[in-house]
Amino acid sequence: MKFSNITIKNFRNFEKVNINLDNKNVIFGMNDIGKTNFLYALRFLLDKEIRKFGFNKSDYHKHDTSKKIEIILTLDLSNYEKDEDTKKLISVVKGARTSANADVFYIALESKYDDKELYGNIILKWGSELDNLIDIPGRGNINALDNVFKVIYINPLVDLDKLFAQNKKYIFEESQGNESDEGILNNIKSLTDQVNQQIGEMTIIKGFQQEITSEYRSLKKEEVSIELKSEMAIKGFFSDIIPYIKKDGDSNYYPTSGDGRRKMLSYSIYNYLAKKKYEDKIVIYLIEEPEISLHRSMQIALSKQLFEQSTYKYFFLSTHSPELLYEMDNTRLIRVHSTEKVVCSSHMYNVEEAYGSVKKKLNKALSSALFAERVLLIEGPSEKILFEKVLDEVEPEYELNGGFLLEVGGTYFNHYVCTLNDLGITHIIKTDNDLKSKKGKKGVYELLGLNRCLNLLGRENLDEITIDIPEDIKGKKKKERLNERKKEIFKQYKNEVGEFLGERIYLSEIDLENDLYSAIGESMKRIFENEDPVHYLQKSKLFNMVELVNNLSTKDCFDVFEHEKFACLKELVGSDRG
């Protein structure tokens, strides 16, 4: 079984959205944009504990009760032969699934507001043909849907004590009838009786019992006596059991008092229940902002659990935490955002096999960018150090205003651009006009920088070129020859360069260092105490860039920002300067 799509109409802040889904989904966006409402749309559809309350007027988009609330979930059942969950669902839906369209199945909710009852009653339907759905059979608040699905909603402020108390009976009823425990239970009962007997013999207890009995009889003429007993003897010893944490190698017990520790223990209990109590159902986790109260390291640990453990086969996670996305793979990213009305953009995120060894590195960089409005993609750490310095001086609140610098680690542009584009996040690219010599082909070069930009536009690579440089020309002189050729190539393909600018792709005429020299050449000479600062900078790019950045004046930073070769920075901050 695979979640395929959801359509939400006239529900809370959603006028109409149509969103592609998968079995693992991450929902993100600004505060108060609709992430919780998205989860509640699923809860109304699949969770009887929420559904039984029906809809209030405020649940209708802009309180427009003249239109129905509609929520339609599309499932892909094409893996029937291999998937046990698909078989579970099919065994319950029976005749609602027709052979004509057996691989697709719809679960739909609609609610028309009753002005007299001041209430929106819920009608559930399902079937394989969207235009011919049938009512889901049920009785009262329970229907056939509830026999196959179990929604586990985890509140950001999950209450451990309440969760444990609610499920204590189920957890410990499992041990009843276990012969190996019968002797132990009898011993506990005997010991409990002894405890109560000893309690009753205490002078302070006897005195209190006598006085309170006397007070009671003075109020009500009744032949009774008041005695104090341990709750364990009356309710059973399970009633007094609460979880403690015991560190390995330590004989002491520690209360689960920290919020982070309590939350992780709550997740452990939910997982236990999913495996034991709901093993015959399809369990769907709806997890809301779990990062609250969790230290960064615990968020990373939870990320590993969510994306790698089979327990979390189906989940919808809302979050503001990049750390929770470090381990993501085969995950549907859903961005809830707003222009004039709330819209949802989605992207199926996969780490290609070729990138498997650097998955965490790729995810770590991308996960922070997902929460931005505009992202400037740059090649490496030197660019990042420089641009951070310039922006800190010129536009220090660029991140607060939605900007983000994303270091792609060389040439992984495509991996990020596709994701950002699908999610409606503005992306800007700054890259060098690189040439790459072909192995085994003397004097033959690939137009690497131009091809990189063309590939981002879905275009084919340009043909290789030949650059004839005599063998006696090496080192700095050879580089100068190559740079002259880069300038010629830049002019030759000026039309393509113009197209790139229209797509927010900024290709350097040569490279970052030469762009920088065009903007603040004299300052570079002064700081490096060198008449060829570009060559000096490139000898040890990162190390020397740090030296440069540490000595840039505020004027230098403004000169870089205002220079045409760094127009990408204005694009990032949305500046209309100049």
Curated annotation (Swiss-Prot):
This entry's comment on the bound cofactor is:
Rapid, sequence-specific cleavage at physiological concentrations of Mg(2+) (4-5 mM) or Mn(2+) (15 uM). In presence of >20 uM Mn(2+) has rapid non-specific cleavage activity.
Q: How does activity depend on pH?
A: Optimum pH is 9.0.
Q: Which residues form a coiled coil?
A: none
State the InterPro entries in the record.
Answer: AAA_GajA/Old/RecF-like (IPR041685), Bact_Antivir_Def_Nuclease (IPR051396), P-loop_NTPase (IPR027417), TOPRIM_OLD (IPR034139)
- Listed GO molecular functions? endonuclease activity; metal ion binding
Q: Where does a divalent metal cation 1 bind?
A: 379, 463-464
Where does this protein hold a divalent metal cation 2?
383, 513
The cofactors required by this protein are: Mg(2+); Mn(2+)
Disruption effect? When this gene is missing the Gabija type I system does not confer resistance to SpBeta in B.subtilis.
Query: What is known about regulation of its activity?
Result: Endonuclease activity inhibited by all NTPs, dNTPs, NDPs (at 0.5 mM, UDP not tested) and AMP-PNP; not inhibited by any tested NMP, dNMP or nucleoside. Inhibited by 100 mM NaCl, 100 mM KCl, 0.5 mM Co(2+) and 0.5 mM Ni(2+).
Which UniProt keyword terms apply here?
A: Antiviral defense, Endonuclease, Host-virus interaction, Hydrolase, Magnesium, Metal-binding, Nuclease
Residues holding ATP: 32-36
Q: Where is this site: Interaction with GajB?
A: 94, 97
Toprim domain: where is this region?
A: 370-510
Per the UniProt record, which EC number(s) apply here?
A: 3.1.-.-
Q: Which Pfam families match?
A: AAA_15, OLD-like_TOPRIM
Query: Could you say what the effect of mutating residue 541 to A is?
Result: Loss of endonuclease activity
Single GO biological process annotation from the record:
defense response to virus
**What does the protein in this record do?**
Component of antiviral defense system Gabija type I, composed of GajA and GajB. Has no detected ATPase activity. Expression of Gabija type I in B.subtilis (strain BEST7003) confers resistance to phages phi105, phi29, rho14, SpBeta and SBSphiC. Expression of Gabija type I in E.coli B (strain ATCC 11303) confers resistance to phage T7.
**How does the record describe its quaternary structure?**
Homotetramer. Forms the core of the anti-phage defense complex. Interacts with GajB; 2 GajB dimers dock at opposite sides of the GajA complex to form a 4:4 GajA-GajB assembly (GajAB). GajAB interacts with Bacillus phage Phi3T Gad1 protein; this interaction forms a 4:4:8 GajAB-Gad1 complex and leads to GajAB inhibition.
Q: What is known of its domains?
A: The N-terminal ATPase-like domain seems to have lost ATPase activity, but may still bind nucleotides. The C-terminal Toprim (topoisomerase/primase) domain probably has the endonuclease activity, but when expressed alone (residues 348-578) has not activity, showing it requires the N-terminal ATPase-like domain for function.
Q: What is this protein called?
A: Endonuclease GajA
